[in-house]
Amino acid sequence: GRERWLRLAATGDVAWQRAQPLLRSPVRQRLRIRISELPAGVTLRAGESALAALTDLADPAEPEYAVASRLWPKQDAPRTIPTPDTGTCVVELWRYAPEATADRGCVDPLSLNLSMGEVMDERVQLAVQSLMENISW
């Protein structure tokens, strides 16, 4: 097969910083549902669950998963739950298929960084910073 290579004028981390104003979170919507109603194909960890798998952050009380919004059932979708409860999980509906760039059962680190941008929890922000420092550009 053929391969295509992209060469950046700057190092990866510098290019990432310069691109920040042009980027947005891949998360279109966040839904809370009963974990027992989670569709079978939705297994990719996202949000704090992915951050916990990739850093020293503790697992969240509610597991978080990602799926492309176009794959989420429009009819017969699981009923949403308004507040956290025992046996619930969070499903992030993404603008694109997160599986395309996923690694080790988690969304990719750059997309994870973008999806966590509005979280104000200091321990989460420290974990995101640690994640970004460990990327080999």
Write out the residue ranges for each language-model feature.
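Long, low-complexity, charge-rich intrinsically disordered regions
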Residues: 17-137
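Short, cationic-aromatic polyanion-contact patches
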Residues: 2-23
